[in-house]
Amino acid sequence: MEELQGYLEIDGFRQHHFLYPLLLQEYIYALAHDHGLNGSILSEHMENLSHDNKSSSLIVKRLITRMHQQNHFIISVNDSNQKGFVGHNKNFHSQKISEGFAVIVEIPFSLQLVSSLEEKEIAKFHNSRSIHSIFPFFEDKLSHLNHVSDILIPYPIHLEILVQTLRCWIQDAPSLHLLRFFLHEYWNSNSLITPKKSISFFSKENQRLFLFLYNSHVYECESVFIFLRKQSSHLRSTSFGSFLERTHFYGKIEHLVVVLGNDFPKTLWLFKDPFVHYVRYQGKSILASRGTQFLIKKWKYHLVNFWQCHFYLWSQPDRIHLNQLCNHSFYFLGYLSSVQLNSSVVRSQMLENAFLMDTAIKKFETIVPIIPLIGSLAKAKFCNGSGHPISKPFRTDLSDSEIINRFGRICKNLSHYHSGSSKKQSLYRIKFILRLSCARTLSRKHKSTVRAFLKRLGSELLEEFLTEEEQVLSLLFPRTPSHRPHRERIWYLDIICINDLANHE
């Protein structure tokens, strides 16, 4: 970030926010390439990209020269006779420019966030990026709340909504026109946003740009929570957003209070409960409150109206589910979570009188949902739809050890992620499916029976599926036979993404 600020110490940029000329600077594409190698969570496959000739500085210089010489920057894509900027090697040039454009549009947000963090002296904790860090928060807060709302964030039904979202931040009209060009180009070719899904699907060639657009859209959807939180609580609350791809946003709190305060002056009395907690991951969020059913219904009503009025889109009311925590389990981040009432009888004796008191204690429970996991395994061809293990097709040139290592790595990843489950019987079933699928795969390769193969390789195959979690539990509870390790939860604060089973190869 210090390096980026050094490039941008220009009075004209700070005063007029002219981002468009930066596309003609070579260092922008170097920054985009560096971010793709080091800063991207979703681009792990780009480790060897530095040896790719497409990323050489010579090609970037030729691209910038072509942009300088082009009379009309954007020409008709349908005109095959022209060989201008887009017509010649259109896909590659669009990809490189969109990567540089993604770095440029992040500049206003990044600089404002850095200055905000320096003023407030807010420390950065990398562990807060972990997905598992959400669940200790649930354990601490949800047991004291009454109602929970499952919310699917509405998707933009028109591309212009994404452009209008950035108009308040970016005042450079040519940059916004270029953004429209990229959106319409990829809408026609890749179907950037589909109405059947609740979140955006990003083109593999332009993940950074589309992830930035989706995060900006989600930030606008969540802006109402900042305002209502400030109005409903007597405590001063500060907020800032830190998103993936090192894309940072600084909350427009003051402007938001002025706008929404004029539009909703008579509804603020409905939000007096300070115990409201909001958590989001990707396109799904959880809103929990200690208030009454009436209050939580009002939250739903005003959220739907806010999204309809502010984004000019129809947000279906059935995308927000309201339930009581004690009677409902909600699915979030691969876990089926709920708050259970555990009754305990306590015997109290005072002098000659004895009393039996039955107390109910709320406890946060996390369960591994077996049906969705079996569905994922079936999709990846480890088992059929009913969970019966089948042989997985692999390349014939793979050795037995490579096949066993791949199965073992998938099993360890699942065990590592679902280590926070309070009931691990379902997880043991998943391990059994993977182990037997591995045995069927190897027996098919050697044209043998599963029984004969397991008898010959049983102990070695079993060792590959021992997880780090079981080793940690043996260290934590070595001499406590009363503890049941299969009920102990362990949250790892180094998990920042969910691995797709289908991409294990």
Swiss-Prot record:
Location(s) in or outside the cell: Plastid, Chloroplast
InterPro entries membership: Domain_X, Maturase_MatK, Maturase_MatK_N
GO molecular function: RNA binding
BP GO terms, sorted: mRNA processing; RNA splicing; tRNA processing
Keywords, in A-Z order: Chloroplast, mRNA processing, Plastid, RNA-binding, tRNA processing
Gene it is expressed from: matK
Protein name: Maturase K
Family matches, as Pfam families: Intron_maturas2 (PF01348), MatK_N (PF01824)
Protein family according to the UniProt entry: Belongs to the intron maturase 2 family. MatK subfamily.
An annotated GO cellular component: chloroplast
Biological role stated in the UniProt entry: Usually encoded in the trnK tRNA gene intron. Probably assists in splicing its own and other chloroplast group II introns.
